Curated annotation (Swiss-Prot):
Sequence similarity: Belongs to the purine-cytosine permease (2.A.39) family.
Hydrolase among keywords: no
Highest taxon of the lineage: Bacteria
Subcellular location: Cell membrane
Membrane topology label: Multi-pass membrane protein
GO molecular function: nucleobase transmembrane transporter activity; symporter activity
Species this protein is from: Bacillus subtilis (strain 168)
Cross-referenced Pfam families: Transp_cyt_pur
Protein keywords: Cell membrane, Membrane, Symport, Transmembrane, Transmembrane helix, Transport
Transmembrane segments: 36-56, 60-80, 116-136, 151-171, 190-210, 225-245, 265-285, 308-328, 350-370, 373-393, 425-445, 448-468
The UniProt record lists the keyword Glycoprotein: no
Protein name: Allantoin permease
Amino acid sequence: MKLKESQQQSNRLSNEDLVPLGQEKRTWKAMNFASIWMGCIHNIPTYATVGGLIAIGLSPWQVLAIIITASLILFGALALNGHAGTKYGLPFPVIIRASYGIYGANIPALLRAFTAIMWLGIQTFAGSTALNILLLNMWPGWGEIGGEWNILGIHLSGLLSFVFFWAIHLLVLHHGMESIKRFEVWAGPLVYLVFGGMVWWAVDIAGGLGPIYSQPGKFHTFSETFWPFAAGVTGIIGIWATLILNIPDFTRFAETQKEQIKGQFYGLPGTFALFAFASITVTSGSQVAFGEPIWDVVDILARFDNPYVIVLSVITLCIATISVNVAANIVSPAYDIANALPKYINFKRGSFITALLALFTVPWKLMESATSVYAFLGLIGGMLGPVAGVMMADYFIIRKRELSVDDLYSETGRYVYWKGYNYRAFAATMLGALISLIGMYVPVLKSLYDISWFVGVLISFLFYIVLMRVHPPASLAIETVEHAQVRQAE
């Protein structure tokens, strides 16, 4: 699908990274998408989130049910939101122009970019803690660097590990999207080695799977379990709230819809359930071994005394962290930043700007406890859920999966609305965010905050449809006629 020459030459709304991909560049098969998920899921913060569910009192079986439920919902959301990317070869920042306007799209795109950059900082810090353990084992004096000097609450050795691990990401970014595809193919499966070994250790030290999975939770009745269960599902989805939005950045490379849907199904529910089994087993095993559930896998590694195990485990965890960072937390904001200033910034420049901003996120504060992690995830869900709701309502209900590609790059086309902004999309987004996040400040409505992603998606989805029906833009009438003519021709 090609643009008109006028759109191709416009620097205000396009550059070579934002225009539709030609069919010759759409080469990703199901295995490529499955590999992305294998790499993304197996990482330290995901383990911490799953382990945190055990730590707050849910039983192993309850946690496993939470993971399976969340992964199936994620699969559905990703397959739906990725449809337009595959059909038109477009990235997220361009697709969202249809609902928010050609200029208004920059606001949710940059919001999503900010969230991804925060996640990039968190993931990079998590990987750097593993690297720090490796350096402490190789060089015992590493922890004494700087004496008692702390910078913003982190020891100098930890800060140096953070910066060094951050710099490794730049090597992968230097080679662009094709290197990301190749990296993901082997990075994900490699992580199974470490978590498989840790499961073996946990089962051995606990005396089998029976003692691990027979541990009771503190929630017994349905009424006691429902809200922790729902909050857990929301927390898991919150981890991937950014990727739900920017999945078109990847599905635009798919050969067909079938390939992206199959790949995400193979790579998400099954892989996530397997990872959940490993996380639950290791966390519960740590409770048997150390008298308390340890929700951070790096803390468990720090208690091992075999240097070979530590070296192999740390290297693999670092690879896994780079894998998820590049796929989930760098690609998306890179496109978003390029979309905001396409005349000056392409995908590669956006990638390096993203990496640079992640240095200033102070992520060690967010990783202090399971409580702080879940507070952050709830906030993410409340902010990004409404954007996903608007996107799906616009594409599937209002547009009926039909977009005018040329108009997405036009300053005089149907997606200009009012000076480039569609107030209906912003009103629906703000209402969804307000209702989903109000529980942070109003205790009686805390239950809404516990399921913030679902509330945000549902409210914005419905309200956007209402606004587009009650006060439709003039361009929508033209689209309705065009759709009717197409159906008659068929």
